[in-house]
């Protein structure tokens, strides 16, 4: 069971991943939570660079890919040991943020993602969709025009991916309550894996 959570900052994905982890653990599943960028010792160093330093869009993409490649090795090991792996961001983030937001192009980012991940695709992705205005309000960044425009492109990237991969990506309305979103997450997980309740 490999599940990823996607969405722009302020969408509520980190909350939902924690709630799903608790839900699965209560049902006896071994659960591993990881995040991107990061998730490994070297990945966390890369995360620090990405958060603290100005880099070009291409350098940003390559740093994400390097972090992801290291993490995939661990994810494969956990999956082989029967863990449910829950990941806060994965390849769809790069397509949305670098491909659409930074305008590097969807196809090239997808090709590089495939190389970095050895083709490891999540079983299920929850994209928590929230409009940019709401996300910025939640993050306290309402007056950042350049951020707003960038995030509009990112959101569009996510929506394009959701339309292209409806069998994998479940779109959830991020404006609803935490409890309502969690109910939908649980319903979809139970539907796919027939968990004992």
Swiss-Prot record:
Keyword annotations: ATP-binding, Kinase, Nucleotide biosynthesis, Nucleotide-binding, Transferase
Keyword ATP-binding: yes
Molecular function in Gene Ontology: ATP binding; dTMP kinase activity
Short name of one Pfam family: Thymidylate_kin
InterPro entries xrefs: P-loop_NTPase, Thymidylate_kin-like_dom, Thymidylate_kin_CS, Thymidylate_kinase
Enzyme's top EC category: transferase
Entry keyword Magnesium: no
Catalytic activities: dTMP + ATP = dTDP + ADP
Residues annotated as binding ATP: 7-14
Entries under PROSITE patterns matching the protein: THYMIDYLATE_KINASE
Any GO BP: dTDP biosynthetic process
Coiled-coil annotated spans: none
Record-level GO cellular component terms: cytosol
Enzyme Commission designation: 2.7.4.9
UniProt-listed NCBIfam families: DTMP_kinase
Role according to the record: Phosphorylation of dTMP to form dTDP in both de novo and salvage pathways of dTTP synthesis.
Family membership: Belongs to the thymidylate kinase family.
Protein name per UniProt: Thymidylate kinase
